[in-house]
Amino acid sequence: MPLHLRMLFPAFTLATGFALGFIQPTGLLLGSAFAALLLVCDRYLPNWLWLMLTLLGGIALAAHLLPGFNPWQLWKPRRLSVDAAPYALRLSWDKLLLGTTLLAWWLAQAPRPAISHRRAGLTCVVTLLSVPLMAIALGLVAWQPKWPEGLLLWLAVNLGVAVMAEELLFRGVLQPALIKRLGVWPGVLLTASLFGAAHLPFSALFALLATVAGLGYGLVFLYSGRLSLAIALHAAVNLLHVLLLSYPLRLT
C-alpha cells in the first residue's frame, strides 16, 4: 500500500478525535509528529535511532503520558463482577493513534514465513488454557461467568484499541528487532518480559501473568509468521477474562 494511503490511518484518527473535541491542538501536533517519525523517517534515520524513538513515543502514547488527549467515556463505572471494582469503558485516543499508526507501518512490511502451523496451533490452545487458570491460581480473579451488557462495544474497543496497539508495538516492532540482535529465544523471552513489565502498575502478580501471556503471543507470531494470529489470541484471552472471570481484577 502506498505511503500516502497508509498515512490516512493516523490522519483519520487525529481528525476524528480533534473534530469530536477529544484531541487538543497539542495532541494533534504531537500525534502528527509521531506518525511522521514512524512512517516517513524510517527510511532516513539509522535503524537503532528510529527504533528507540518509536518505542519511546509508543510507550508515551500507550501510557497516556503525552498532553492533548482526552479519553471518551463510553460506559459510566459499573460493576461487572460482584468481587471486582466498578469498571468504566473508555476509548483512549492516544492509544488508538498508536495502533492505527503502527498498523499503517506494518502494512508496508514484508510477509514473514511460517515455521510450524502445528506449533502455532498448540501454543494457542496452551495459552488459552494456562493464562486463565494461572490468573485464578494467583488469586487475581475468580470464576465469575457472565454476559455483560454492551459486550460487543467492549470487544470493539478492546480489540481495536488496546490489543492492536500492544501487539503491533511489542510483537510487530520490538520482538523482530530483539530477535535480530539477540537470537530467537532471548528475543521472544525479553519481549514477553517487557510486555509483563508494562503491566506492573496493576501489580507484580499481574505483570507475571502478562509475561506468560506475552510469551504465548510471541511464540504464535514466531511460529505462524502472522501478527494477526497473535492479535486474535490476545483478544481471545481478554474475551475469556471478561466472560468467565472477575473483571477487571478481584478485590483483595
Model-derived regions: residue spans:
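Cytoplasmic-side transmembrane-helix entry/capping segments in multi-pass membrane proteins
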Residues: 47-58, 117-126, 177, 182, ...
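Alpha-helical transmembrane segments and their cytosolic membrane-interface
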Residues: 1-15, 154-157, 163, 177-179
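Membrane-helix interface segments
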Residues: 5-7, 45-49, 147-151, 183-186, ...
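Functionally important transmembrane alpha-helices
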Residues: 164, 185-192, 196-198, 204-252
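N-terminal, membrane-interfacial amphipathic/helix-forming hydrophobic leader that caps
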Residues: 1-110, 242, 246-252
